[in-house]
Swiss-Prot record:
Residues that carry a glycan: 9, 326, 330, 333-334
Consequence recorded when altering residue 1043 to Y: In HTOCD; rat ABCC9 construct containing this mutation shows gain of function
Record organism: Homo sapiens (Human)
Lineage: Eukaryota, Metazoa, Chordata, Craniata, Vertebrata
Listed name of the protein: ATP-binding cassette sub-family C member 9
Chain intervals with Acidic residues compositional bias: 951-966
Oligomeric and partner information: Interacts with KCNJ11. Interacts with KCNJ8.
Entry binding sites for ATP 2: 1346-1353
Length: 1549
C-alpha cells in the first residue's frame, strides 16, 4: 500500500474550490502550531535557559504556581486524551481506505507530542520563575485555536454534525485550546510579565524558603500531586540510610497545629457567641469543625464521587469487550455499509477502544480515590492537631479544683488526648463514605437491573439482608476486645508484681505459684481472645461468602425465572458489579460504629471545654494591687546571726535576732497582702476563712501548723489556684525608690518560683529539670546543686546531670526528687520563692544543709522574698515573719518574739514539739536515709551500666561487621524480610494447624477459581450452542455445589488462620513467662524492668491481635493475585510476555516501600509517646507551671511535639498513597495488557470475560499484598524480640540428688560449713567472693559486716545458689547444697531482704501463698511480729486487702510482715540481708527483739547495715573486697584496735 500524506489519489491534492476546501491542506495547516512550538521550546529545554535564568534560589526541586496552575494541568490532560481519541479515529478511518492517508492521524500525533512538550516546558518555566517565556505558549494556543476553528468550520460546511466522531473531536479541540488561551491571558493579566510597564514579582512560598520543610505535597505540580512523584527521593534514599526526623523535616505552615488551632478556635468562639444568650444550649463542636475543615471534606467527597462513578466503567467495558468478542466468535459482526468516517457509536463499539477507555478509566478512578484518601487524611491530621492544641490550652486554664476534687481525672484527660481525638480523626477519614456509599449502592443496583432484570434484585437483597449481620459481628468484636483489654491489664499487673519481686520469689521458691496465677489470668484472656478470633473469623467469612451467595442466588434465579440464556457479557459484568456492591455495604457497619464513637467523643470534648477555669491572672501583673503606700508599713525584725557550722539543734530560749539585713523597720515594704480572704476548692464551702496576712519583701516568712490546717492551700490561694469567695490578694507595686542591685535588675517583680509539696519532674535531664527553661549559668548551677546536696546523687547517674529522669527515665527516690524540685525553685532568678514543705522527704542532715546553704545563704543573701511551709519547728528561729495556721484560719502572725510575748501557750506548745523532734533526731542521725537512697541508686545504676556495657559490646561487634560489609550488603539487610522469624511464628502455632491452613487456603482459592471457570464454560456453552433445559440443570447444579463448597471453605480458612494465631500466641507467651521466671537473677539485674514488661505488653498484644489478621489478609490477597495471573495466563497465554516487566516493576515497588514504611511507622510510634507524656506531665505539674508562668513555653513544646508526630504520620500516609497509586497503575497496565491479549488472541468469550474479571480484581489486591507484607515485617519484630528472650539460659533447677532423698525436716540443726568458697555472678565476670572458709554452729547468731561492695550480700545469695559457685562448697547439716534441687534448697531456708516486698492480695496470701498453714499458725506468726492487734482491727482480718506493693502499710509494718512470713516457714536457718536498713530505729528495735526470742534456737545470719545491730552476735564475719579478713567473736575483734571491725565500729559511733 502506497504511503503518502494525502493518499495516492491525485484528486486529494485538488485545490480548485479553494485551499481551505481541501481537507488534506486543512490538516496540514493544523501541523503548523505544533511544529512552531517544538521549534521554539526544544532549544530552551535542552539548553536549560530557563533554569539558568532563575532569579530565586530554591533548595527544593519545586516552584511557585502561576495563576490557573491546576486548571492548566487539567485542560492539558483533557487535551491529551482528545488527541489520543483523534489518533485512534484517524487510524481506524485510514484502515477503511484503500491507500494510506497520513493526514488523518499525523497532525494528531504531532499535537500529542506538542501538548506534552507544552506542559514540560511550562513546568520548567515555573521552576525557574521566568514567566516571560510563557509568551511562546500563548502564541501556540492562539495558533492552535485558529487552525482548529478553521477545521471545524470546514466540517460544518461539509455537512458533518455531532453524530460524527471527527466533528466532536475537533469541537472539543477548539474549546480546550480556547480555554488554555484564556489561561495564558489571565497569567499575563495577573503577572504583567509582558505588555505592562511594571511586572508583578512573586516569590516562592515561604515554606520553600525554609530548609527544614521537606513535605512538598502542597507545592508540587498537579501530576506530582496525583502520583506522589516527589516522594521518590525519600523512599529510594531509605535503602541507603534509615529515615529519621531530620529527613522528614517540618510541617508546612498551613498544616501546623497552631495554624489549625486558630481556625478551629475562631469557629468555636463564634459558636459560643451564638449560644451566649441561651443558657440551656452549648456551643456545637460539630459546626465549628465544619466551619474550620468543611471545605477539604467537600473536596474529598467530590473526588470520591468521581472515583465511584468511574469504578462502574469496569463492568460496562467488560460487557462491551466480551460482547464484541462473542460477536466475532459467532461471526455476527456487521461489516456492511462501512463509511470513511466514524460515528461516535461505532468508535465506542470497537473492542480495542473499549480496552483503552477501561485503562484510562481505571487510572483516573484510582487517582481520584487516592486523592480523596489523602485529602481526608491530611484534614484528619490537621483536625487532631487543632483539637490537641485546644485541649492543651484548656488544661493550662483548668481550675485546680477540677483535678484535686476528682471532677476531672488525669485518666480522663489522657483518654481525651490519646483516644477521643483519634476517634474524631478516624471518623473524618471515613466521613466521605457516609454520603458516597448510598450513591454507589443505588448505581450498582440500577446497572445490575439493566443487565439481568428482576433476578438481579434477588442478589442485591441477599447482600442487603446479610449486611446487618456484619454490624452485629462488629459490635461483638468491640465487646470482646474490651473484655480482652481488661484481662490483659490484670495479667500485666500480676506480671509486673512478679518482675518487681522476682528476687524474693526465687529466694522463697514461689515462682511456680505466681507463674500459675499469671497463667490463670492468661487463660481468661485467651478465652476472650477466642471469642474475638471467632467473630473475626465470621467477619472474614462474611466478606468472602456474601458475594458468592449473592451471585449464586442471582444466577440460579436468572436461569429458571428468566426465559433468556445467561450471556458471558452479562455474567461477568454482573460479577464485577457484585464485587463493587459488597464493599460499601460491609464498610457501612464500620462507618456507623465510628460515627457513634465520634458523637460520644464530641460530647466528652464539649464537657471538658466547658469545665471551670481559673480566674484572670492580672494579679500577677500588679493590676489588682493596692497603692504601695497602703501596704507599706510593716513591723520589722532586728538582724540575727547565723551559725552555719552547727547542725540542726535549735532552741527557742536562745533565740536572737540576726544581722543579715540592715533595713529601716518602719519602711519595710510588703510583697503580698491578703485581706479578708475566703477561699474555696470549688465546693462553695470556704476551705480558708478570714485570712488577713502580710508577706514582707526580701524576708523569710514561715507558715506552720498541724497537718491539714491549710498551709499548702494558703500558698495556692496566693498563687490564684483557689476560688476566691471574698477578699483580695494584693501584690505590691514596684518601689522605684528601692536601690537597684545587679542581681535583681533583670527580675520581674511578680515572678514566682515554686516547689510543690509533692515533687514534680519533667521527662527531661536533671539539668533541664533544674534550669526549667532559664539560661544555663555554670556558677549559679553549681551553687544550687551544692546547696541541695545533689552532686553526690548526680555523680551516681550514668550520664551525670544529662541523665533523663521523670516517668520515662531513671527512677529516683522521693528525697532525690524533692531536692531537684527545690533546686529548680532556687535556680530561677525570681523575686519571690514559695517552698511547700521542702524538708518532708529529707533526712536531718540534708534538711540542715538545705536550710543553711540553700535558704539562709543562697536565697536570703540574694535578697529574695521567701515563703516556707514546714513542720520543722526547729527552724523557726531563722524566720523573719511567722504565720501560724489552724483549721483553715490564721491563728497568729508576727515575729517569733511577738508570738513569745503575746501567745505564751502557743510558744510553749512549739517548745514541747521541738523537744520531741530532737529525740527523733538522735535516732535519725544513725538512720541516714540519704545514704540508703544513694545506695539504692548505685545498685540501679550498676544494673543499667552492666546492661549498657553488654549492648555497647554488641554494637561494637556490629560496627566491626558493618565495616567489612559493602553498601550492597547493607541494602540487602535493610530490604530482607525476616523469613526465619516468620517460620518460628508459624511453627509456634503447631505443624498440624499450619498444614491445615495452607491446604485449606489453597483449596478455597482453587474452588473460587473453579466457580468462575464453571461460569465461563456455562455462559460460553449457551452462547455457542444455546443448550436446552437438561444441560442448564447440569450447569446450575454444578455451580451451586461449587458455590456451597466455596462458602464452607471460606469459614474453614478464616477459622484456621485465627486458631493458628491464637495457638501461636498462647505458646509464645507460655514459653516467655516460663523462661523469664526461671531465668538467673543476673538477667534481672542487667535488664531494665520496662524492657521485660514490654515483651509481655506491647509485643504480646501484637502477637495476640495484630499478626493473625495481617497474616490472613496477606495470604488471601497473595493467593487472589496469583489466581488472577494464572487465570489470565490460561485464558490468553500471550499475557505471559508482558508479565515479566510487570513483575519486575512490582518487585522494586514493594522492595523500596517496605523499607521506607517500616522507618516511618517507627517514627510515628516513637514521636507519639513524648506527646502523650507531655500532656500527662503538664496535668500533673499544672500548679508549678502556672506559678512559674511558663504556660507559653509549655504550649510551644506541645505544638512542636504535635507537629513532629503529625509530620511522621503524614509522611507515612503519603508513602501509602505512593504505593497504592503505583500498584493501582500497575493493575491498570495488567488490565490493558490482558484486554488487548484477550481481544486479539481468544476465541472463547467466556474465558475473555473471566480473564478481564480477574484483571480487574488484581488492581484491588496488589497494594494489599505490599501493605500487608510491610505490616507483617514490622509486627514480626515483636516475635523476634520475644524469641530473643527464649534463647536465654535458665537456672539449673535440677540437682544430683532426687528431692525424695532429702530428709523431710532438713535442715534440722542449722549447721553451716563453708569450704574454700569462690563465687561470681557470671562466667565472664571476676569473682566477688574468694576462698571463704567459715564454720557456723547450730543455732548460732552470726553477724556479717564490711564496707559497701565487700561481698556481704553475695554470701547471702550463695546460700540460695543465686550466684555461680565455681569453686568450693557450702555444706548445711551434712549436705552439699550444690547437689540439691534448687526448689528444695530455697524452700527450706528463710530470708528477710532489705526492701520489704508485699504482693497485692490478702494478708493470708502474703504470709502463706502455698496455703499450707493453719490460721492458728498464721496468727502466731503475726503475734510474734507484733502485728496481731493491728491485723485484727482490719476488716477481714487475715483476709484483709493488701494493695500493690503493700502501699496501704508503712515501711516498718511491711518489714514486720516479712518477719512473720519468715517465721511461718519454720526454717532452722534465717538470713537477714540488711533487713533493718530502710526502717526507723523503733521498728528496728522491735525486729531485733523478735528475732532474738522467736528464733532463739535457730541459726540467724545477719548482714549488717549498722554495725551496732550485730554487737550481740555470737560470731562476726568481716569482709573486704570479697575476702573474709576477720572471723571471731565481738570481744575478740574489738580487742584488735587496728582491725577492720574495730575501725567500722569507731566510724559508726
Amino acid at each position: 500500500m502506497s504511503l503518502s500524506f494525502c493518499g495516492n489519489n491525485i484528486s486529494s491534492y485538488n485545490i480548485n474550490d479553494g485551499v481551505l476546501q481541501n481537507s488534506c491542506f486543512v490538516d496540514a495547516l493544523n501541523l503548523v502550531p505544533h511544529v512552531f512550538l517544538l521549534f521554539i521550546t526544544f532549544p530552551i529545554l535542552f539548553i536549560g535557559w530557563g533554569s539558568q535564568s532563575s532569579k530565586v534560589q530554591i533548595h527544593h526541586n519545586t516552584w511557585l504556581h502561576f495563576p490557573g496552575h491546576n486548571l492548566r494541568w487539567i485542560l492539558t490532560f483533557a487535551l491529551l486524551f482528545v488527541h489520543v481519541c483523534e489518533i485512534a479515529e484517524g487510524i481506524v478511518s485510514d484502515s477503511r481506505r484503500e491507500s494510506r492517508h497520513l493526514h488523518l492521524f499525523m497532525p494528531a500525533v504531532m499535537g500529542f507530542v506538542a501538548t506534552t512538550t507544552s506542559i514540560v516546558y511550562y513546568h520548567n518555566i515555573e521552576t525557574s520563575n521566568f514567566p516571560k517565556l510563557l509568551l511562546a505558549l500563548f502564541l501556540y494556543w492562539v495558533m492552535a485555536f485558529i487552525t482548529k476553528t478553521i477545521k471545524l468550520v470546514k466540517y460544518c460546511q461539509s455537512g458533518l454534525d455531532i453524530s460524527n466522531l471527527r466533528f466532536c473531536i475537533t469541537g472539543m479541540m477548539v474549546i480546550l485550546n480556547g480555554l488554555l488561551m484564556a489561561v495564558e491571558i489571565n497569567v499575563i493579566r495577573v503577572r504583567r510579565y509582558v505588555f505592562f510597564m511594571n511586572p508583578q514579582k512573586v516569590k516562592p512560598p515561604e515554606d520553600l524558603q525554609d530548609l527544614g520543610v521537606r513535605f512538598l505535597q502542597p507545592f508540587v505540580n498537579l501530576l506530582s500531586k496525583a502520583t506522589y512523584w516527589w516522594m521518590n527521593t525519600l523512599i529510594i534514599s531509605a535503602h541507603k540510610k534509615p529515615i529519621d526526623l531530620k529527613a522528614i523535616g517540618k510541617l508546612p505552615i498551613a498544616m501546623r497545629a497552631v495554624t489549625n488551632y486558630v481556625c478551629l478556635k475562631d469557629a468555636y468562639e463564634e459558636q459560643k457567641k451564638k449560644v451566649a444568650d441561651h443558657p440551656n444550649r452549648t456551643p456545637s463542636i460539630w459546626l465549628a469543625m465544619y466551619r474550620a475543615f468543611g471545605r477539604p471534606i467537600l473536596l474529598s467527597s467530590t473526588f470520591r464521587y468521581l472515583a465511584d462513578l468511574l469504578g462502574f466503567a469496569g463492568p460496562l467495558c467488560i460487557s462491551g469487550i466480551v460482547q464484541r468478542v462473542n460477536e466475532t466468535q459467532n461471526g455476527t459482526n456487521n461489516t456492511t455499509g462501512i463509511s470513511e468516517t466514524l460515528s461516535s457509536k461505532e468508535f465506542l463499539e470497537n473492542a480495542y477502544v473499549l480496552a483503552v477507555l477501561l485503562f484510562l478509566a481505571l487510572i483516573l478512578q484510582r487517582t481520584f480515590l487516592q486523592a480523596s484518601y489523602y485529602v481526608t487524611i491530611e484534614t484528619g491530621i490537621n483536625l487532631r492537631g487543632a483539637l490537641l492544641a485546644m485541649i492543651y490550652n484548656k488544661i493550662l486554664r483548668l481550675s485546680t479544683s477540677n483535678l484535686s476534687m476528682g471532677e476531672m481525672t488525669l485518666g480522663q484527660i489522657n483518654n481525651l488526648v490519646a483516644i477521643e481525638t483519634n476517634q474524631l480523626m478516624w471518623f473524618l477519614f471515613l466521613c466521605p463514605n457516609l454520603w458516597a456509599m448510598p450513591v454507589q449502592i443505588i448505581m450498582g443496583v440500577i446497572l445490575l437491573y439493566n443487565l439481568l432484570g428482576s433476578s438481579a434484585l434477588v442478589g442485591a437483597a441477599v447482600i442487603v439482608l446479610l449486611a446487618p449481620i456484619q454490624y452485629f459481628i462488629a459490635t461483638k468484636l468491640a465487646e470482646a476486645q474490651k473484655s480482652t483489654l481488661d484481662y490483659s491489664t490484670e495479667r500485666l499487673k500480676k506480671t509486673n508484681e512478679i518482675l518487681k519481686g522476682i528476687k524474693l520469689l526465687k529466694l522463697y521458691a514461689w515462682e511456680h505459684i505466681f507463674c500459675k496465677s499469671v497463667e490463670e489470668t492468661r487463660m481468661k484472656e485467651l478465652s476472650s481472645l477466642k471469642t474475638f478470633a471467632l467473630y473475626t473469623s465470621l467477619s472474614i467469612f462474611m466478606n468472602a461468602a456474601i458475594p458468592i451467595a449473592a451471585v449464586l442466588a442471582t444466577f440460579v434465579t436468572h436461569a429458571y425465572a428468566s426465559g433468556n440464556n445467561l450471556k458471558p457479557a452479562e455474567a461477568f459484568a454482573s460479577l464485577s458489579l457484585f464485587h463493587i456492591l459488597v464493599t460499601p455495604l460491609f464498610l457501612l457497619s464500620t462507618v456507623v460504629r465510628f460515627a457513634v464513637k465520634a458523637i460520644i467523643s464530641v460530647q466528652k470534648l464539649n464537657e471538658f471545654l466547658l469545665s471551670d477555669e481559673i480566674g484572670d491572672d492580672s494579679w500577677r501583673t500588679g493590676e489588682s494591687s493596692l497603692p504601695f503606700e497602703s501596704c507599706k508599713k510593716h513591723t520589722g525584725v532586728q538582724p540575727k546571726t547565723i551559725n552555719r557550722k552547727q547542725p540542726g539543734r535549735y532552741h527557742l530560749d536562745s533565740y536572737e535576732q540576726s544581722t543579715r539585713r540592715l533595713r529601716p523597720a518602719e519602711t519595710e515594704d510588703i510583697a503580698i497582702k491578703v485581706t479578708n480572704g475566703y477561699f474555696s476548692w470549688g465546693s462553695g464551702l470556704a476551705t480558708l476563712s478570714n485570712i488577713d496576712i502580710r508577706i514582707p519583701t526580701g524576708q523569710l516568712t514561715m507558715i506552720v501548723g498541724q497537718v491539714g490546717c491549710g498551709k499548702s492551700s494558703l500558698l495556692l490561694a496566693i498563687l490564684g489556684e483557689m476560688q476566691t469567695l471574698e477578699g483580695k490578694v494584693h501584690w505590691s507595686n514596684v518601689n522605684e525608690s528601692e536601690p537597684s542591685f545587679e542581681a535583681t535588675r533583670s527580675r520581674n517583680r511578680y515572678s514566682v518560683a515554686y516547689a510543690a509539696q509533692k515533687p514534680w519532674l519533667l521527662n527531661a535531664t536533671v539539668e533541664e529539670n533544674i534550669t526549667f527553661g532559664s539560661p544555663f549559668n555554670k556558677q549559679r548551677y553549681k551553687a544550687v546543686t551544692d546547696a541541695c546536696s545533689l552532686q553526690p546523687d548526680i555523680d551516681l547517674l550514668p550520664f551525670g546531670d544529662q541523665t533523663e529522669i521523670g516517668e520515662r527515665g531513671i527512677n529516683l527516690s522521693g528525697g532525690q526528687r524533692q531536692r531537684i524540685c527545690v533546686a529548680r525553685a532556687l535556680y530561677q532568678n525570681t523575686n519571690i520563692v514559695f517552698l511547700d514543705d521542702p524538708f518532708s522527704a529529707l533526712d536531718i542532715h540534708l534538711s540542715d544543709h538545705l536550710m543553711q546553704e540553700g535558704i539562709l545563704k543562697f536565697l536570703q543573701d540574694d535578697k529574695r522574698t521567701l515563703v516556707l511551709v514546714t513542720h520543722k519547728l526547729q527552724y523557726l528561729t531563722h524566720a523573719d515573719w511567722i504565720i501560724a495556721m489552724k483549721d483553715g484560719s490564721v491563728l497568729r502572725e508576727g515575729t517569733l518574739k511577738d508570738i513569745q510575748t503575746k501567745d505564751v501557750e502557743l510558744y510553749e506548745h512549739w517548745k514541747t514539739l521541738m523537744n520531741r523532734q530532737d529525740q527523733e533526731l538522735e535516732k535519725d542521725m544513725e538512720a541516714d536515709q540519704t545514704t540508703l537512697e544513694r545506695k539504692t541508686l548505685r545498685r540501679a545504676m550498676y544494673s543499667r551500666e552492666a546492661k549498657a556495657q553488654m549492648e555497647d559490646e554488641d554494637e561494637e561487634e556490629e560496627e566491626e561487621e558493618d565495616e567489612d560489609d559493602n553498601m550492597s550488603t547493607v541494602m540487602r539487610l535493610r530490604t530482607k524480610m525476616p523469613w526465619k522469624t516468620c517460620w518460628r511464628y508459624l511453627t509456634s502455632g503447631g505443624f498440624f494447624l499450619l498444614i491445615l491452613m495452607i491446604f485449606s487456603k489453597l483449596l478455597k482459592h482453587s474452588v473460587i477459581v473453579a466457580i468462575d471457570y464453571w461460569l465461563a464454560t456455562w455462559t460460553s456453552e449457551y452462547s455457542i450452542n444455546n443448550t436446552g433445559k437438561a444441560d442448564q440443570t447440569y450447569y446450575v447444579a454444578g455451580f451451586s455445589i461449587l458455590c456451597g463448597a466455596g462458602i464452607f471453605l471460606c469459614l474453614v480458612t478464616s477459622l484456621t488462620v485465627e486458631w493458628m494465631g491464637l495457638t501461636a500466641a498462647k505458646n509464645l507467651h507460655h514459653n516467655l513467662l516460663n523462661k523469664i521466671i526461671l531465668g538467673p537473677i543476673r538477667f534481672f539485674d542487667t535488664t531494665p524492668l520496662g524492657l521485660i514488661l514490654n515483651r509481655f505488653s506491647a509485643d504480646t498484644n501484637i502477637i495476640d491481635q495484630h499478626i493473625p489478621p495481617t497474616l490472613e489478609s496477606l495470604t488471601r490477597s497473595t493467593l487472589l493475585c496469583l489466581s488472577a495471573i494464572g487465570m489470565i495466563s490460561y485464558a490468553t497465554p500471550v499475557f505471559l510476555v508482558a508479565l515479566l516487566p510487570l513483575g519486575v516493576a512490582f518487585y522494586f515497588i514493594q522492595k523500596y516501600f517496605r523499607v521506607a514504611s517500616k522507618d516511618l511507622q517507627e517514627l510515628d510510634d516513637s514521636t507519639q509517646l513524648p506527646l502523650l507524656c507531655h500532656f500527662s506531665e503538664t496535668a500533673e505539674g499544672l500548679t508549678t507551671i502556672r506559678a512559674f508562668r511558663h504556660e507559653t513555653r509549655f504550649k510551644q513544646r506541645m505544638l512542636e511535639l504535635t507537629d513532629t508526630n503529625n509530620i511522621a504520620y503524614l509522611f507515612l500516609s503519603a508513602a501509602n498513597r505512593w504505593l497504592e497509586v503505583r500498584t493501582d497503575y500497575l493493575g491498570a497496565c495488567i488490565v490493558l495488557t490482558a484486554s488487548i491479549a484477550s481481544i486479539s488472541g481468544s476465541s472463547n468469550s467466556g474465558l475473555v470475560g473471566l480473564g478481564l474479571l480477574y484483571a480487574l480484581t488484581i488492581t484491588n489486591y496488589l497494594n494489599w499484598v505490599v501493605r500487608n507484607l510491610a505490616d507483617l515485617e514490622v509486627q514480626m519484630g515483636a516475635v523476634k524480640k520475644v524469641n530473643s528472650f527464649l534463647t536465654m539460659e535458665s537456672e539449673n533447677y535440677e540437682g544430683t540428688m532426687d528431692p525424695s532423698q532429702v530428709p523431710e525436716h532438713w535442715p534440722q540443726e542449722g549447721e553451716i560449713k563453708i569450704h574454700d568458697l569462690c563465687v561470681r555472678y557470671e562466667n565472664n565476670l571476676k569473682p566477688v567472693l574468694k576462698h571463704v572458709k567459715a564454720y557456723i554452729k547450730p543455732g548460732q547468731k552470726v553477724g556479717i559486716c564490711g564496707r559497701t561492695g565487700s561481698g556481704k550480700s553475695s554470701l547471702s545469695l550463695a546460700f540460695f545458689r543465686m550466684v555461680d559457685i565455681f569453686d568450693g562448697k557450702i555444706v548445711i547439716d551434712g549436705i552439699d547444697i550444690s547437689k540439691l534441687p534448687l526448689h528444695t534448697l530455697r524452700s527450706r531456708l528463710s530470708i528477710i531482704l532489705q526492701d520489704p516486698i508485699l504482693f497485692s492480695g490478702s494478708i493470708r496470701f502474703n504470709l502463706d501463698p502455698e496455703c499450707k498453714c493453719t490460721d492458728d499458725r498464721l496468727w502466731e506468726a503475726l503475734e510474734i511480729a507484733q502485728l496481731k492487734n493491728m491485723v485484727k482491727s482490719l476488716p477481714g482480718g487475715l483476709d484483709a486487702v493488701v494493695t500493690e506493693g503493700g502501699e496501704n502499710f508503712s515501711v516498718g509494718q511491711r518489714q514486720l510482715f516479712c518477719l512473720a512470713r519468715a517465721f511461718v516457714r519454720k526454717s532452722s536457718i534465717l538470713i537477714m540481708d540488711e533487713a533493718t536498713a530502710s526502717i526507723d530505729m523503733a521498728t528496728e528495735n522491735i525486729l531485733q527483739k523478735v528475732v532474738m526470742t522467736a528464733f532463739a534456737d535457730r541459726t540467724v545470719v545477719t548482714i549488717a547495715h549498722r554495725v551496732s545491730s550485730i554487737m550481740d552476735a555470737g560470731l562476726v564475719l568481716v569482709f573486704s573486697e570479697g575476702i573474709l579478713v576477720e572471723c571471731d567473736t565481738v570481744p575478740n575483734l574489738l580487742a584488735h584496735k587496728n582491725g577492720l571491725f574495730s575501725t567500722l565500729v569507731m566510724t559508726n559511733k
